[in-house]
């Protein structure tokens, strides 16, 4: 059973919410139901933790469940179950797999679901490299195996470390477990391997091995695994390598990370080299030089999917030439030179029980379909996204309808069809008032979302902002989950982010709360204290500013490096916006475009447009927000974010490219400059530090000479790039 399952609905079909009742207030019948729920829920969490090393809840929440079970048993000793958690020997250990930072980011892949997505991918390649329509674009094609991504580090041919993908930046150290996987060599074959190479691929479990494992689980009266992927993930992340060794895991290589050298100049060639080292590579790996061959491969693999002895969820295309890969580069989350062409999602029929409205941290009202539980692609689904009011109207769904549910991309459940549109039922109306604070909900022009206008008077928004603040990609405070924040907020223990860091002052009050004790409270306070120092990008993301996601926050942190620099820029931009007054002949739209253009030029951060900048300035212009941030800064210390590129002499410098570049495109040159920490401007000004002049450079070159700005040609620029920004030129 999946961690996302609504276990309460299964164990308590009448949906009596007994969790809020104190043990002494339960009737005998209620105690029976509650003890069954707790026994199965705790067993479920034990399974995720011990068998999969994948804890679904913080320690404090787990401890609260165990304590509640024990207290109910004290009031009803004759109802103690044979499978009671109180009968289990030992307690939940605190150990965790060590965390390791990837030396080269372990990124995801961009997904495509339609043939058109593949055409668009090839179109982007052709435009970037100025290729003709009929010019071949050679790609490798291979099945996308559904396993757990892992990076194997070999130094002088010897396996020294194995790390899971994690969040792409930091993964889990699973070296002891990987050493017991039979088809992962401890020493590479041959002698032509690089001094250091990280070989990346998927740890997986074959379908036949999965069936055998579940057969053993049945014989031993143990819980069955839901699917091979979950079994592989749990087996690899065991704390005891002996358990991993019994699980018949396999490894299939599909790429590499850090490498001191590459013995081939194509993706296909590199995979054959990796295969010669003794690692498994897909025997279906092939090359294709046009979209017809790529789609033929996709259709062939999809047709054979059921007969393969391992799960796959699509096909991966990669540019074959490694120099093309390097030039095409990476986005913040994925390589641009690759595309995962996913198979159609699996579908199932069920009944729509209700439509609930959730209020997000920015006030967006999101409809969520509550479903009669149904298995889709090996996972039990009881909720699905309905996106927005337009989607509900398009589908015409109402509570009681039979609907078709799919896991889009095999991940997010969504309703794709109403199977009973002609049945006479009342139309479901989207609410125009917030279901939490009753404020008016409005839909802004050009947007599909309805938003609560209550702002920070809306408890739901305040709670969601606090949840966002402590989330994994923000402050990442372990043990402070949504249920705790909701409870603490309701009792006015926390109302702002700074209050979280003052919870130690309320230690005794916390200890006296039901489900808490000295150990749980002290663990929480310790976890909070560990986050009093936070990287600049995480701090900025944690503020929950609309349109400022993790990538934008990181771009801002990379550009300004310190909070003081950033805040000074915000203040200066706010002043600039104030003095940019509209002219009498200027429409509101033209005025806004002019302001946006000035502000975009002022910040000069790639991919940061007027919408993001306006949101930033509006946030800090709000007195309440500034007060919340100032209060928070009394409790935490923001660590400057100095990227590895910050050591480049070009870091923070403003560069202008002019004229026609012969060896690379303008976009490539811009990306090279940004990778060295520089900013690229479109016009020459006193702030410009360097001008790179190609052939037929015109007025920009003349202006650079007038302002006595350093000027170099394209060849000199390439030498600078090759030397990571090092050059004798005065900038």
UniProtKB/Swiss-Prot annotation:
Catalytic activity reported: NAD(+) + (deoxyribonucleotide)n-3'-hydroxyl + 5'-phospho-(deoxyribonucleotide)m = (deoxyribonucleotide)n+m + AMP + beta-nicotinamide D-nucleotide
Keyword NAD recorded: yes
UniProt-listed Enzyme Commission number(s): 6.5.1.2
Keywords, ordered alphabetically: DNA damage, DNA repair, DNA replication, Ligase, Magnesium, Manganese, Metal-binding, NAD, Zinc
Domain named BRCT: residues: 645-731
GO biological process, one term: DNA repair
CDD domains registered for this protein in UniProt: BRCT_DNA_ligase_like, LIGANc
Cofactor: Mg(2+); Mn(2+)
Family matches, as SUPFAM superfamilies: BRCT domain, DNA ligase/mRNA capping enzyme, catalytic domain, Nucleic acid-binding proteins, RuvA domain 2-like
GO cellular component: cytosol
Record-level Gene Ontology MF annotations: DNA ligase (NAD+) activity; metal ion binding
Annotated signal sequence range: none
Keyword Ion transport: no
Top-level taxon in the UniProt lineage: Bacteria
EC class name: ligase
Binding positions for Zn(2+) per the UniProt entry: 434, 437, 452, 458
Binding site for NAD(+): 59-63, 108-109, 142, 165, 202, 318, 342
Positions annotated as active site in the UniProt record: 144
HAMAP family on file: DNA_ligase_A (MF_01588)
Function: DNA ligase that catalyzes the formation of phosphodiester linkages between 5'-phosphoryl and 3'-hydroxyl groups in double-stranded DNA using NAD as a coenzyme and as the energy source for the reaction. It is essential for DNA replication and repair of damaged DNA.
Family: Belongs to the NAD-dependent DNA ligase family. LigA subfamily.
Protein name (Swiss-Prot/TrEMBL): DNA ligase
